[in-house]
Swiss-Prot record:
Example of a GO MF term: UDP-N-acetylglucosamine 1-carboxyvinyltransferase activity
Residues binding UDP-N-acetyl-alpha-D-glucosamine: R93, K162, V163, S164, V165, D307, I329
Top EC class, one word: transferase
Name of the encoding gene: murA
PANTHER family for the chain: UDP-N-ACETYLGLUCOSAMINE 1-CARBOXYVINYLTRANSFERASE
One GO CC annotation: cytoplasm
Family of this protein: Belongs to the EPSP synthase family. MurA subfamily.
Protein name, entry field: UDP-N-acetylglucosamine 1-carboxyvinyltransferase
Domain of life: Bacteria
HAMAP family cross-referenced by the UniProt entry: MurA
Amino acid sequence: MEKFRVHGPYKLSGTVDISGAKNAALPILFATILAEEPISLTNVPDLKDVDTTFKILRKLGVVIERDANGVVQIDASHIQHYVAPYELVKTMRASIWALAPLVARFHQGQVSLPGGCTIGARPVDMHITSLEKMGAIIELDEGYVKATANGRLQGARIYMDKVSVGATLSVMMAATLAEGSTIIENAAREPEIVDTAHFLNAMGAEISGAGTDTITIKGKERLTGCQHHIVADRIETGTFLVAAAISGGKITCQGTKADTLDAVIEKLREAGMEVTVTENSITLDTKGQRPKAVNIRTMPHPGFPTDMQAQFTLLNAVAEGTSRITETIFENRFMHIPELNRMGAKAEIEGNTAICQGVEQLKPAEVMATDLRASISLVLAGCIASGETIVDRIYHIDRGYEHIEEKLRRIGAKIERFRESASSAE
């Protein structure tokens, strides 16, 4: 199993080119199933989850070509299979997004119940009940969700009992080829939903209201080819801003938009960081100052993103003062805290809240990653700890951060990937 060896403490400073957003690329890739003509996508990140999505699409009969510049050509005009198999789906919960476009275009689809990060219950119930309201017939059989429809899906008014990014995207995809109009109420508002809507509209869909809590989709009989540029990854952006903030550095994130990160930037400024923005970049300068502790409460967009909670837990671990970090989106998303405590952090978990008393210096340790965002916080902790830190189970990082060690080295980190031999693991 691969691990990272990280040496510290080092100041992390420089310029980082931000990759395309994983959380936009995945639904957009699955949405290509809807198109009867070829699609061209740019700024597609090179990630394990993207590779898994390619494998699922190819299993369905989609033709995919990718060049060295991240341009992906996709042709879904000759899909002949309608099953996303367990051996691929088990590693990635986003695989459920294959179901809606399959049943919308081909009136049938099967997806194995998905896997992914182990951070609490992420049921697919809202995906299923929404499709049923649009006329799909759903069966759960031997670990598979099977959806069929007698002809086109029907437009419907769908109220989301809980704000759900995944279910909002599923309904939006399904509704593009449904008969009549669909209205999603209490819809998620994330920037990745807006980007997916832009992509679908470029294919000929008619979607309005994306980015608000009410989205309207007027169904079309067919969708065509298009070109689309994947939006920049706001979570990668926020992660590198935190990297500078905890290490006394100065960093510029290029090719990214500040308006997708308002809550994060506000908290960084509250922590005493100087943050300046341009149309396509964000710069954070610590001025050599230790961050001040900030209280965090995760919320659906435009609130503070749950995918930045682990990084800000680390920031608060080395900040001046005491903070409260409340996680309202997912269960079990504090699994990084015991690992940070092994490195000398002082954090206690009380229900869905962590109380963190900042320390001046972290210590090196052997730690284990438990999910994507927790794992990057442990790597960054190693960058500022005094000595050598080993981070195990780094496959989580490869699911969501493109070329992470190369990018970290460019801003001053001392990090290497290695594979522990079987004999040394015994």
